[in-house]
Design a protein with these regions (language model features):
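Nucleo/cytoplasmic regulatory scaffolds in medium-to-very-large eukaryotic proteins
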Residues: 2-11, 16-26, 77, 107-112, ...
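Short, compositionally biased P/S/T/A/G/V-rich stretches that sit at domain boundaries
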Residues: 2-82
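Contiguous beta-strand segments within globular domains
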Residues: 56-106, 142-146
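Eukaryotic intrinsically disordered and solvent-exposed regulatory patches
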Residues: 70-74, 88-89, 132, 145-149, ...
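Hydrophobic/aromatic-rich core segments of domains that either
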Residues: 296-420
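Conserved beta-strand elements of beta-rich interaction domains across eukaryotes
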Residues: 90-94, 107-109, 165-167, 188-190, ...
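Extended acidic/polar, glycine-enriched regions
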Residues: 94-213
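Secondary-structure boundary elements
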Residues: 191-335, 345
Length: 420
């Protein structure tokens, strides 16, 4: 039985399950007969077209999409940018007489209206999706295509099928995991929600896999190196797993705001068995002391391998470091911020209340607190839910502090962000 249950059924007109797991997929039938007898074009000379092989051109595509550093044996591309795909047929493809459809699926219940089933057809001026396709060249029996995912498509792992339209029905290629590919957010694409204009900033906030996290206090600023390791083996799979384990519907994973907000809840374990369990005591016998961590890779790989058991223990800089890895891994420009003399609002009134008793001593029972330092994250994205001038660097905090209402989560959860 899969670890993830399908989300509750849609109670609207569709009345079908909503897929919340990228780890499950639908195996499409190899042949579908046409339900109605309708006029068909004559069979092309040489017989029906048949798919012999699909080439994802991983090396050239990953270089072009700035994903060559990921240690994973699958194609990884960024949305809103063309990638090359080759289809080897049993004979030379003829654009005038042959017809085939490329299908990209994500999740167990793919449907076009939720952008989980994408169909593109070479030669058609009007596509059924916002994905683009063009014939680059045909050499012998291989046809190379340029495919451009929509700049607002779902981020995650897609399955690939090629379906040839024949007089009898649809002949589909077999399920082949080697043609699966990941789509990430794209800070290089102007139409993407996370577009970042400056190349130096893209290199630093997306591609840099190490950094310094500042700590200490205002009069004695310290720092510790942190290995974000967003390209290391298993990390991309772990980041997708985090969204799956949090039961985030696939149809919402096209929106950077929703992905960031969901992830800010899933990095802490307080109410959803997220990645890290916090501890501000001096007893770390049941886990690892927060000061002992030097990077995110071990934490995320442990959480992924143990299928959602929170890793012990964390404090603010550990939460921020791991969250930074998650964001950069999925293509979101992100950085860790340290704030000194950091006021903590205990009751949500957006004020810092310092209460003294009659002797002038601090009343810790009713006072808000001021921490020596606190770490959070900033992520660069365009806000479509508030006025455009608030777009840019947004504050997101995965350290569990106070409850926050969220559209994507049941009832109340410990999450924070995005805030301009």
């Amino acid at each position: 039985m899969p670890i993830f249950d399908t989300c509750e059924k849609n109670r609207g007109r569709l009345n079908r399950p909503i897929s919340c797991s990228n780890g499950e997929n639908k195996i499409m039938p190899e042949f579908e007969i046409f339900e109605e007898a309708t006029p068909r074009a004559p069979m092309p000379t040489g017989g029906n077209l048949a798919v012999m092989n699909i080439n994802m051109y991983e090396e050239i595509n990953r270089l072009a999409h700035h994903t060559d550093a990921y240690k994973i044996s699958k194609l990884i591309i960024r949305r809103g940018q063309e990638f090359i795909m080759g289809i080897v047929f049993n004979r030379r493809f003829d654009l005038k007489t042959d017809l085939f459809v490329i299908e990209f699926l994500i999740g167990k219940n793919p449907i076009p209206t939720q952008k989980t089933l994408i169909s593109v057809t070479p030669g058609e001026n009007k596509q059924t999706s916002n994905w683009g396709v063009r014939v680059v060249e045909t050499i012998n029996t291989e046809t190379k295509l340029g495919i451009t995912p929509a700049a607002d498509c779902i981020v995650g792992l897609y399955n690939t099928y090629v379906t040839v339209i024949t007089n009898a029905g649809k002949q589909r290629s077999q399920r082949n995991p080697t043609t699966d590919f990941y789509v990430l957010f794209n800070p290089w694409a102007q139409k993407d929600q996370v577009y970042l204009k400056n190349e130096e900033e893209r290199q630093e906030y997306v591609l840099n896999d190490v950094g310094m996290i500042y700590n200490g206090d205002y009069n004695n600023i310290g720092s510790r190196p942190w290995n974000y390791g967003q390209f290391q083996s298993g990390i991309l799979e772990a980041c997708i797993f985090i969204l799956d384990f949090g039961k985030m519907p696939l149809q919402y994973r096209d929106d950077a705001i929703k992905v960031v907000r969901k992830a800010s809840a899933m990095i802490n374990s307080l109410d959803d068995d997220g990645v890290l369990e916090g501890s501000w005591s001096d007893d770390f016998m049941l886990g690892t002391a927060p000061t002992a961590w030097t990077g995110s890779v071990e934490i995320l790989n442990q959480y992924y391998s143990e299928r959602g058991v929170p890793v012990k223990f964390a404090q603010c800089w550990v939460y921020a470091g791991v969250f930074n890895t998650f964001l950069r891994c999925l293509g979101l420009p992100a950085r860790v911020i340290t704030n000194y003399c950091s006021a903590h609002d205990n009751n949500g009134n957006l004020q810092t209340n310092i209460v003294l008793d009659e002797d002038g001593s601090l009343d810790t029972q009713v006072s808000d607190t001021i921490w020596n330092f606190h770490c959070w994250n900033e992520v660069f994205l365009k806000r479509h839910d508030i006025p455009e001038n608030f777009s840019g660097w947004q504050v997101v905090d995965s350290t569990p502090q106070e409850i926050s209402e969220a559209r994507l989560l049941p009832l109340w959860s410990c999450i924070c962000g995005s805030h301009p």
